[in-house]
Amino acid sequence: MKRRDFITSTVAAAGTLMIPLEALAQSDRRKELLIVANETGPNSLDIHTVGANRPSYGVSWICYDRLMTFGKKKGPGGVTMYDFTKLEPELAESWQVAPDGMSVVFKLRKNAKFHDGAPVTAKDVKWSFDRMVSVGGFPTFQMKAGSIEKPEQFVVVDDYTFRVNFIRKDKLSMMDLAVPVPCVYNSELVKKHVTEKDPWGLDWTKANEAGGGAYKVESWKPGQEIVYARYDDWKSGKLPKIKRIVQREIPSAGNRRALLEKGDVDITYEMPPKDFLEMSEGGKVVVQTTPIENAIWYVGMNVTRPPFNNPKVRQAVAYAIPYEKIMDSAMYKRATRLWGGKDNKAHGTDWPQPHGYAYDIPKARALMKEAGVADGFETTLSFDLGSGTVSEPACVLIAESLALIGIKCRIEKVPGANWRAQLLKKDMPLILNRFGGWLNYPEYFFFWCYHSQDAVFNTMSYKNPAMDKFIEAARFESDRKKYAEDVAGFVNMAFDEVPRVPLAQPNMDVAMQKNIKGYTYWFHLQPDYRDLEKA
């Protein structure tokens, strides 16, 4: 399909008055308009709602304020990136940690207002924090990772003074207050929409924004487009240069690339690795690449379901994965290999790090025989269609290879908007997925992905009390030698029992016009439009 035909057909199919990107670009070349093309957009305007996807994190980041944010530094290749060791003011203009380290007092900006003009007070912060530790699921578990767990920890001192009491000394607590989840809601506005069954107003905030951040949602057509408008009365940082953002969902990678190279789109960050490789070599646009910290592509097996409850079957799968083919044909070498290490032991405290599995069909067949399933079995291999540019070709290669050891896979494509909800069900036997921990510590990754509390991202439903002890010890250990021993303990178990098989550490690639300046790599993998400007 031709690009112009595609644009016309999407507008007609939507049955809306969405302006074609081509017309937007040609009619408004002003510096304050940014046009973005994505494969998948937000499925919710509220990060606290069940199943909110990664693009929803971007809504939270720019439409809501947090008490603090992270500083910046130069990363690999000179790309500007966040600095998790440096906290800076956002809604809070200052803070003071108690001498005993068991509480922190925040002083709020007295001139901050929500998008409807209502003042932001400590009561709003208290209500928002109570909400995030009470709604359950992802937001509650995220804050628990930093020992932020109970409403009783949050205290309104006065209208513009707020205190957080810590239940234990945890190096992640302050950092956890600067991730997307602890955002501040207009509590009085949301309270107008609560019900007995929905005491936190989640149904309303899923489709309605209630923040006071640098941008407000001007319009949202789920599955099609979200439009942001700058909030000119924002006081929690430097007012952004970009006044309006049109973020359009265009499923076809070919169309996104064509629109970008023609100049109809300013930026895209969801493209096949092959396209990023070609565009970086072509020189028409700028491609910025950063290895994603604390992140892996992996094959996960549900250990509660036979035959994946047998470690030997899981090890057989680990030896049957065609790692090199996936790296070459699905990832186009735009990732870091995590297979073929010296052995299945931890080497240092870095994460991710390579395991000792490599492509070895005879060894995989021998393990299948030892497991009592020499004749193989049938299963379903599922992936997120929202990351299909990598996942689909990788799944085809994995299925072809597993067939060599008798495992016949039916490939299931799950729409991106439904993927998180599907993960929550914990009923998919075999998946290809990508996960990255927001806070760059191995114990944080393992707390999310391997701990027996069985968080949403423990997609394998793996539970091992012995590993839990190592994870918990590492979270609070201050002695470096003991910390290294704890990390080695849980990494060694993960490699031996292999409920998930790491494939590669992904890159974050972003392609943009040459006049776009200010891009920053963030751990949540969404562009911070507040930083961008057109030169």
Where do the PLM segments sit?
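Extracytoplasmic/peripheral linker and loop segments enriched in polar/acidic and small residues
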Residues: 337, 355-358, 404-419, 424, ...
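Ligand-site clamp/hinge motif
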Residues: 109, 203, 232-278, 400, ...
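Gly/Pro-rich hinge or "lid" segments in bacterial periplasmic/extracellular proteins
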Residues: 69-82, 86, 180-240, 244, ...
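Surface-exposed binding/hinge segments that line
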Residues: 107, 143-194, 219
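Aromatic- and charge-enriched surface segment that lines or borders ligand/interaction sites
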Residues: 93-138, 157, 163-168, 256-259, ...
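N-terminal lobe/hinge region of extracytoplasmic solute-binding protein
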Residues: 37-99, 210-212
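Long beta-strand-rich cores associated with HINT superfamily self-processing modules
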Residues: 512-535
